């Protein structure tokens, strides 16, 4: 008999997610069983962990398992576990709300594309709510370990706007999830169909999955029923990798991550010696929707001597590799380890170093063996990997090898060029790796600073991601070659520079008074004014010195709300350009000032993508055209 019953409304995001999920995941509806068995496995892991310090929680029943049964007459499937169970408060928190930051943003990102939605929802982790894909009503009976029998909870919902919760009596610890199937989902009321799904998705989990099967006598007559274990139920990572198939690795990844898509690659390693541990690492194919959310949970599942300790142990993987999924099973950490203990622990530091190296080796191998797959990975996770040079000094060169860029060597904006590729194509006598940063690929590709490099056939990396400028403040050289911005006023081409011709000397002398007039006019607004012979089609550019903050870095600071020091540009004029020649001959000071201002504004617009006073610029153009 239920008591203390109340009806509550779902959190608005739950209602929205349920509707989207039912429609988007319908083609992959059998995953409901995978998700519910995974939840049962997690409940068993949590009980084992808590029972380390309080064995009484086992209540004399330490054989943990999950049981799947069905009733064809009632149209129900029941998934039962004897794991940690839930209290009334936990039921309301876990089944009535989505305790994830950024949920609203996630739901906004979902559009009309069902295939895309299916992938996104899979990354989000539907868990318990997947039951409503096949059920029009779900009943949950649960009792938390250590609670009295009359402290159990009944939860029910039709998956629409509300759910009910009440107190009931339940003798056994754990959770029963009862699915009342829709009329058109009765295909799942079949022992062999359920066996097939369990074998496909849950064969590898370290918890026995049992089904109630009929027993027959020697004459073939039905004589009873028994619970039969139908999965291997050994922890997959404890097996030799030679005994694990690719399909098993993929299925285990989906169990760990709740992802729908196969991983790109994985590595399974058992290490013995000073540090004894087993690791199983995966590189996902798709970035999670909240990869750049500050509260995004990441890290590995941590086991100690095969006992589950915690999810999302971020201490073992650096932040720039936060997309890595998998687990580590250590023999050396204490069973009572906490996140605080992990923080300043020599064993943790050694494991982190080893797992970081292993992760980078996986990516190096992928890049070498399958360039196409690696570029797919780069499109998903390249921005995160670019955080590496700043975060991981010890592995900076290794991370740098994994970076990919757009370049003047290729026509498109795709980032396919490695620094090693660039070095192989360097001109004889070229000592630096040249790059330009801009707001967009188009802006970088059409920058006037490229004119000299295009003329000489020198390749330039075209960088337009917001993180690039920050990354390059840490990645200043690669393989003994300096990385050099072509927008710097003190650009040094070394042996590739043109020797000063007699014509250039004459131009410098002839334009000397013109340069002084421009300096006097602009005063403190620029650092200096000078002629440049690095332009072919453009009359003027602005550039910064090596010791100054670049334009893109200043924008990055401004976007982050940081104080931005004033950037004073060097104003460079092309004496070969007809406009510069024309302006140099203007005697009227007002007209001269208008033309100089116009040339400076053009150069600033090309460099920064915007002007402080665009209205004045337009007014000046109209005046000079009139």
Curated annotation (Swiss-Prot):
Any one GO MF annotation of this record: ATP binding
SUPFAM superfamilies for the chain: ATPase domain of HSP90 chaperone/DNA topoisomerase II/histidine kinase, HSP90 C-terminal domain, Ribosomal protein S5 domain 2-like
Organism: Haemophilus influenzae (strain ATCC 51907 / DSM 11121 / KW20 / Rd)
Cell location: Cytoplasm
Protein name: Chaperone protein HtpG
Function: Molecular chaperone. Has ATPase activity.
GO biological process annotation, one example: response to heat
Cited HAMAP family: HSP90
A cellular component term, taken from the record's GO annotations: cytosol
Keywords: ATP-binding, Chaperone, Cytoplasm, Nucleotide-binding, Stress response
Pfam entry (one): HATPase_c_3
Main location: cytoplasm
Annotated coiled-coil segments of the chain: none
Annotated region described as A, given as residue ranges: 1-339
Statement: the UniProt record of this protein carries the keyword Oxidoreductase: no
Keyword Transmembrane helix tagged: no
Superkingdom of the organism of origin: Bacteria
Region C: start-end pairs: 556-626
Entry's family note: Belongs to the heat shock protein 90 family.
Region ranges (B): 340-555
Gene (UniProt): htpG
Family matches, as CDD domains: HATPase_Hsp90-like (cd16927)
Complexes and interactors: Homodimer.
